[in-house]
Amino acid sequence: MRPLSMSGHFLLAPIPESSSDYLLPKDIKLAVLGAGRVGKSAMIVRFLTKRFIGDYEPNTGKLYSRLVYVEGDQLSLQIQDTPGGVQIQDSLPQVVDSLSKCVQWAEGFLLVYSITDYDSYLSIRPLYQHIRKVHPDSKAPVIIVGNKGDLLHARQVQTQDGIQLANELGSLFLEISTSENYEDVCDVFQHLCKEVSKMHGLSGERRRASIIPRPRSPNMQDLKRRFKQALSPKVKAPSALG
Protein backbone atom coordinates (compact mmCIF):
# COMPACT_ATOMS: atom_id res chain seq x y z
CA MET A 1 0.00 0.00 0.00
CA ARG A 2 1.33 3.43 -0.95
CA PRO A 3 1.98 5.92 1.84
CA LEU A 4 -0.51 8.77 2.15
CA SER A 5 0.49 11.98 0.40
CA MET A 6 -0.54 15.27 1.94
CA SER A 7 -0.45 16.90 -1.51
CA GLY A 8 -3.34 14.80 -2.77
CA HIS A 9 -6.86 14.26 -1.50
CA PHE A 10 -7.16 13.09 2.09
CA LEU A 11 -9.92 12.30 4.55
CA LEU A 12 -10.37 14.05 7.85
CA ALA A 13 -10.95 11.86 10.86
CA PRO A 14 -14.42 12.45 12.32
CA ILE A 15 -14.55 15.08 15.04
CA PRO A 16 -16.38 13.98 18.21
CA GLU A 17 -19.91 15.37 18.25
CA SER A 18 -19.70 16.01 21.99
CA SER A 19 -17.51 15.43 25.00
CA SER A 20 -19.07 11.98 25.52
CA ASP A 21 -17.30 10.74 22.37
CA TYR A 22 -13.82 11.54 23.67
CA LEU A 23 -12.31 9.46 26.44
CA LEU A 24 -9.42 10.20 28.75
CA PRO A 25 -7.40 7.57 30.60
CA LYS A 26 -7.98 7.31 34.32
CA ASP A 27 -5.58 9.14 36.61
CA ILE A 28 -4.08 6.88 39.28
CA LYS A 29 -1.70 8.37 41.87
CA LEU A 30 0.34 5.98 44.02
CA ALA A 31 3.00 6.50 46.68
CA VAL A 32 5.63 3.95 47.71
CA LEU A 33 6.72 4.40 51.33
CA GLY A 34 9.18 2.62 53.59
CA ALA A 35 12.56 2.72 55.26
CA GLY A 36 15.81 3.17 53.36
CA ARG A 37 17.41 0.31 51.42
CA VAL A 38 14.26 -1.83 51.28
CA GLY A 39 14.01 -1.75 47.47
CA LYS A 40 11.32 0.86 46.80
CA SER A 41 13.00 2.37 43.74
CA ALA A 42 13.93 -1.07 42.41
CA MET A 43 10.29 -2.17 42.68
CA ILE A 44 9.02 0.83 40.72
CA VAL A 45 11.62 0.51 37.96
CA ARG A 46 11.04 -3.24 37.76
CA PHE A 47 7.29 -2.68 37.28
CA LEU A 48 7.69 0.03 34.65
CA THR A 49 10.60 -1.44 32.65
CA LYS A 50 10.79 -5.13 33.66
CA ARG A 51 14.48 -4.51 34.46
CA PHE A 52 16.05 -5.06 37.86
CA ILE A 53 18.73 -2.62 38.98
CA GLY A 54 20.27 -3.57 42.28
CA ASP A 55 22.16 -0.43 43.31
CA TYR A 56 20.58 3.01 43.60
CA GLU A 57 21.81 6.30 44.95
CA PRO A 58 19.85 7.45 48.00
CA ASN A 59 16.47 8.55 46.71
CA THR A 60 15.31 12.14 47.18
CA GLY A 61 11.79 11.56 45.92
CA LYS A 62 11.23 10.95 42.23
CA LEU A 63 7.89 11.01 40.42
CA TYR A 64 7.39 8.43 37.68
CA SER A 65 4.67 8.93 35.05
CA ARG A 66 3.58 6.31 32.55
CA LEU A 67 0.56 5.19 30.53
CA VAL A 68 -0.13 1.55 31.38
CA TYR A 69 -2.87 -0.99 30.71
CA VAL A 70 -4.53 -2.90 33.53
CA GLU A 71 -7.19 -5.43 32.52
CA GLY A 72 -7.78 -3.60 29.25
CA ASP A 73 -8.12 -0.14 30.82
CA GLN A 74 -5.59 2.53 29.94
CA LEU A 75 -4.35 4.32 33.06
CA SER A 76 -2.39 7.53 33.42
CA LEU A 77 -0.24 6.25 36.26
CA GLN A 78 1.89 8.43 38.53
CA ILE A 79 4.09 6.78 41.15
CA GLN A 80 5.79 8.84 43.83
CA ASP A 81 9.00 7.33 45.18
CA THR A 82 9.89 8.63 48.63
CA PRO A 83 13.14 9.02 50.56
CA GLY A 84 13.97 6.28 53.02
CA GLY A 85 14.86 6.78 56.64
CA VAL A 86 11.89 8.98 57.52
CA GLN A 87 10.79 8.17 61.06
CA ILE A 88 7.41 9.71 61.84
CA GLN A 89 8.08 9.98 65.58
CA ASP A 90 11.48 11.70 65.61
CA SER A 91 11.96 13.31 62.18
CA LEU A 92 12.27 17.06 61.73
CA PRO A 93 8.93 18.87 61.25
CA GLN A 94 9.81 19.88 57.68
CA VAL A 95 10.56 16.26 56.80
CA VAL A 96 7.24 15.04 58.20
CA ASP A 97 5.48 17.92 56.43
CA SER A 98 7.02 16.88 53.12
CA LEU A 99 5.89 13.30 53.70
CA SER A 100 2.40 14.51 54.61
CA LYS A 101 2.12 16.39 51.31
CA CYS A 102 3.05 13.22 49.44
CA VAL A 103 0.48 11.22 51.41
CA GLN A 104 -2.16 13.88 50.82
CA TRP A 105 -1.47 13.77 47.06
CA ALA A 106 -1.61 10.00 46.66
CA GLU A 107 -4.70 7.79 46.35
CA GLY A 108 -3.13 4.40 47.04
CA PHE A 109 -0.08 3.26 49.00
CA LEU A 110 2.56 0.55 49.04
CA LEU A 111 4.28 0.20 52.42
CA VAL A 112 7.51 -1.69 51.80
CA TYR A 113 9.91 -3.35 54.22
CA SER A 114 12.77 -5.80 53.72
CA ILE A 115 12.52 -9.26 55.22
CA THR A 116 16.25 -8.88 56.04
CA ASP A 117 15.72 -5.75 58.17
CA TYR A 118 13.48 -5.97 61.23
CA ASP A 119 13.68 -2.23 61.87
CA SER A 120 12.19 -1.57 58.42
CA TYR A 121 9.30 -3.84 59.41
CA LEU A 122 8.75 -1.83 62.60
CA SER A 123 8.46 1.38 60.54
CA ILE A 124 5.35 0.13 58.71
CA ARG A 125 2.78 0.66 61.48
CA PRO A 126 3.68 4.35 62.09
CA LEU A 127 3.56 4.99 58.34
CA TYR A 128 0.14 3.37 58.10
CA GLN A 129 -1.14 5.40 61.04
CA HIS A 130 0.17 8.57 59.42
CA ILE A 131 -1.72 7.77 56.20
CA ARG A 132 -4.96 7.36 58.16
CA LYS A 133 -4.25 10.60 60.02
CA VAL A 134 -3.82 12.51 56.76
CA HIS A 135 -6.81 10.73 55.16
CA PRO A 136 -9.17 10.34 58.15
CA ASP A 137 -12.31 9.93 56.06
CA SER A 138 -10.76 8.02 53.18
CA LYS A 139 -10.73 4.35 52.27
CA ALA A 140 -7.42 4.82 50.45
CA PRO A 141 -6.10 1.29 49.78
CA VAL A 142 -2.84 0.21 51.40
CA ILE A 143 -0.78 -2.87 50.54
CA ILE A 144 2.04 -4.02 52.81
CA VAL A 145 4.93 -5.56 50.89
CA GLY A 146 7.70 -7.71 52.34
CA ASN A 147 10.51 -7.34 49.78
CA LYS A 148 13.74 -9.26 49.16
CA GLY A 149 11.98 -12.59 49.57
CA ASP A 150 14.86 -14.34 47.82
CA LEU A 151 17.29 -13.59 50.68
CA LEU A 152 16.02 -16.35 52.94
CA HIS A 153 19.43 -16.91 54.52
CA ALA A 154 19.34 -13.34 55.92
CA ARG A 155 15.67 -13.30 56.94
CA GLN A 156 14.85 -11.31 60.09
CA VAL A 157 11.09 -10.93 59.52
CA GLN A 158 8.97 -14.06 59.24
CA THR A 159 6.12 -14.28 56.74
CA GLN A 160 3.68 -14.72 59.62
CA ASP A 161 4.84 -11.38 61.06
CA GLY A 162 3.79 -9.63 57.88
CA ILE A 163 0.46 -11.45 57.77
CA GLN A 164 -0.29 -10.60 61.40
CA LEU A 165 0.52 -6.90 60.92
CA ALA A 166 -1.62 -6.69 57.79
CA ASN A 167 -4.54 -8.34 59.60
CA GLU A 168 -4.25 -5.89 62.49
CA LEU A 169 -4.21 -2.91 60.12
CA GLY A 170 -6.82 -4.28 57.73
CA SER A 171 -4.48 -4.31 54.73
CA LEU A 172 -3.43 -6.78 52.08
CA PHE A 173 0.01 -8.37 52.54
CA LEU A 174 2.34 -9.76 49.88
CA GLU A 175 5.88 -11.09 50.20
CA ILE A 176 7.88 -10.78 46.97
CA SER A 177 11.32 -10.79 45.43
CA THR A 178 11.80 -7.78 43.17
CA SER A 179 15.04 -9.19 41.78
CA GLU A 180 13.73 -12.65 40.86
CA ASN A 181 10.03 -12.33 40.04
CA TYR A 182 8.67 -9.59 37.80
CA GLU A 183 5.17 -11.12 37.82
CA ASP A 184 4.84 -10.68 41.59
CA VAL A 185 5.91 -7.04 41.37
CA CYS A 186 3.45 -6.47 38.54
CA ASP A 187 0.65 -8.10 40.55
CA VAL A 188 1.26 -5.74 43.48
CA PHE A 189 0.95 -2.58 41.38
CA GLN A 190 -1.92 -3.88 39.29
CA HIS A 191 -3.92 -4.85 42.36
CA LEU A 192 -3.37 -1.43 43.91
CA CYS A 193 -4.42 0.29 40.67
CA LYS A 194 -7.64 -1.73 40.61
CA GLU A 195 -8.38 -0.89 44.24
CA VAL A 196 -7.92 2.84 43.58
CA SER A 197 -10.19 2.59 40.54
CA LYS A 198 -12.89 0.87 42.59
CA MET A 199 -12.55 3.46 45.33
CA HIS A 200 -13.41 6.20 42.86
CA GLY A 201 -16.16 4.21 41.19
CA LEU A 202 -14.32 4.28 37.87
CA SER A 203 -14.24 0.56 37.13
CA GLY A 204 -15.49 -0.22 33.64
CA GLU A 205 -15.81 3.37 32.50
CA ARG A 206 -13.48 6.13 31.34
CA ARG A 207 -13.46 9.66 32.61
CA ARG A 208 -14.91 12.03 30.04
CA ALA A 209 -12.86 14.85 28.58
CA SER A 210 -13.88 18.34 29.56
CA ILE A 211 -14.08 19.85 26.08
CA ILE A 212 -16.78 22.16 24.75
CA PRO A 213 -19.19 20.22 22.53
CA ARG A 214 -19.44 21.49 18.98
CA PRO A 215 -22.86 21.94 17.33
CA ARG A 216 -24.15 18.92 15.49
CA SER A 217 -23.55 19.14 11.76
CA PRO A 218 -26.77 19.05 9.70
CA ASN A 219 -26.98 16.08 7.37
CA MET A 220 -27.11 16.48 3.59
CA GLN A 221 -30.88 15.93 3.32
CA ASP A 222 -31.53 18.74 5.78
CA LEU A 223 -29.28 21.07 3.80
CA LYS A 224 -31.08 20.26 0.52
CA ARG A 225 -34.50 20.78 2.10
CA ARG A 226 -33.55 24.12 3.59
CA PHE A 227 -31.95 25.24 0.32
CA LYS A 228 -35.15 24.46 -1.64
CA GLN A 229 -37.24 26.34 0.89
CA ALA A 230 -35.05 29.41 0.48
CA LEU A 231 -35.46 29.38 -3.33
CA SER A 232 -39.21 28.65 -3.50
CA PRO A 233 -41.71 31.61 -3.66
CA LYS A 234 -43.21 32.37 -0.33
CA VAL A 235 -46.89 31.39 -0.19
CA LYS A 236 -49.10 32.86 2.46
CA ALA A 237 -51.05 30.20 4.27
CA PRO A 238 -54.86 30.61 4.06
CA SER A 239 -56.39 31.90 7.22
CA ALA A 240 -58.54 29.53 9.18
CA LEU A 241 -62.32 29.89 8.60
CA GLY A 242 -64.26 31.10 11.55
Curated annotation (Swiss-Prot):
Gene3D superfamilies: P-loop containing nucleotide triphosphate hydrolases. NCBIfam families: small_GTP (TIGR00231). It catalyses: GTP + H2O = GDP + phosphate + H(+). GTP binds at residues 34-41, 81-85, 147-150. Belongs to the small GTPase superfamily. Ras family. Widely expressed. Down-regulated in prostate tumors compared to normal prostate tissue. High levels found in colon tumor and normal colon tissue followed by small intestine, liver, jejunum, ileum, bladder and aorta. Lowest levels observed in endothelial cells. Regulator of rDNA transcription. Acts in cooperation UBF/UBTF and positively regulates RNA polymerase I transcription. One of its GO terms (cellular component) is nucleolus. This is Ras-like protein family member 11A. Residues 17-241 are annotated as: Small GTPase-like. It comes from the Eukaryota. Its EC number is 3.6.5.2. GO terms for biological process: positive regulation of transcription by RNA polymerase I. Induction: Down-regulated by TGFB1.
